[in-house]
């Protein structure tokens, strides 16, 4: 996906996708899951493809030192707008970096972070290995890598629920789909992504679902008062089988070996 594509997508992504109940639920569920694995603040966090900061700004509020990296000037401009509304002490804990995820090592000066996040970026990357390698090289030994990816095993659900039966039949063995933002996306499996991480000496610790019920029902008439209840249900589903296996996206958390912290 071309980097400049986000200049057209930044507004619908920030103003619609993240502002919706579904977007708020995604952010909250990922945050809860992250807090079970992150070291305590003021640990350093690199958010690769962090967009407008919806996932990393709450971490900065909690005391973490955050570097938000994104290749899109349009998305970083939205991050600057949102950051300007934060208290001074939160703004001081956030720095914005314009670069591709694949170039994160050079863009951050070779810094090693306590945690590296990459949520919702892999679906838009044709060649995932260079990005995964960069994520793993940016994390310190013993640090956490957190990745959210599109679930290749559930691609038939959405077209089936829309009664697009031909599309659903073809999706069982598909490796991607035409996404909700109008661009083609690529899907992963927990097992396949886990193997990519292990090749970089990063061992998977746990995996979760993220969207289950919220992806299947129309929440356009929902309001903010429902978010807390929806999050509670999605959190419970996210760690139980068979529910997590049916999630539209999955969240994989892994840890880098303590004795692996090679220079680049």
Question: Could you describe each region identified by the protein language model?
Answer:
Residues 120-121:
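Short catalytic micro-motifs in class I SAM-dependent methyltransferases
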Residues 117:
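A conserved beta-strand element that flanks and buttresses the S-adenosyl-L-methionine
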Residues 183-201, 207:
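Short alpha-helix
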Residues 206-264:
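A C-terminal cap/extension of S-adenosyl-L-methionine-dependent methyltransferases
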Residues 129-144:
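A short glycine-rich, Lys/Arg-flanked "PGG" loop and its adjoining helix->strand segment in the class I
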Residues 1-41, 54, 58, 75-78, 144-172, ...:
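Conserved class I S-adenosyl-L-methionine
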Residues 46, 54-104:
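Class I SAM-dependent methyltransferase SAM/SAH-binding core
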């Amino acid at each position: 996906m071309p980097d400049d594509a986000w200049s057209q997508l930044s507004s619908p992504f920030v103003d619609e996708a993240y502002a919706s109940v579904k977007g708020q639920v995604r952010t909250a569920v990922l945050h809860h899951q992250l807090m079970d694995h992150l070291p305590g603040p003021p640990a350093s966090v690199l958010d690769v493809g962090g967009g407008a900061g919806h996932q990393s700004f709450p971490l900065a509020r909690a005391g973490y030192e955050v570097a938000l990296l994104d290749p899109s000037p349009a998305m970083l401009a939205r991050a600057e707008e949102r950051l300007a509304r934060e208290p001074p002490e939160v703004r001081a804990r956030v720095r914005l970096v314009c670069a591709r995820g694949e170039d994160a090592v050079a863009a951050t000066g070779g810094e090693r972070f306590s945690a590296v996040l990459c949520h919702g970026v892999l679906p838009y990357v044709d060649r995932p290995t260079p990005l995964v390698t960069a994520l793993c090289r940016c994390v310190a030994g013993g640090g956490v890598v957190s990745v959210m990816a599109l679930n290749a095993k559930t691609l038939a659900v959405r077209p089936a629920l829309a009664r697009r039966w031909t599309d659903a039949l073809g999706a069982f063995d598909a490796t991607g789909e035409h996404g909700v933002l109008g661009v083609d996306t690529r899907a992963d499996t927990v097992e396949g992504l886990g193997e990519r991480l292990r090749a970089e000496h990063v061992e998977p610790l746990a995996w979760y679902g993220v969207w289950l019920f919220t992806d299947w029902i129309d929440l356009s008439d929902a309001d903010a008062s429902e978010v807390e209840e929806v999050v509670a249900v999605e959190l419970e589903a996210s760690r139980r089988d068979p529910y997590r296996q049916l999630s539209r996206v999955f969240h994989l958390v892994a840890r880098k070996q303590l004795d692996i912290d090679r220079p680049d």
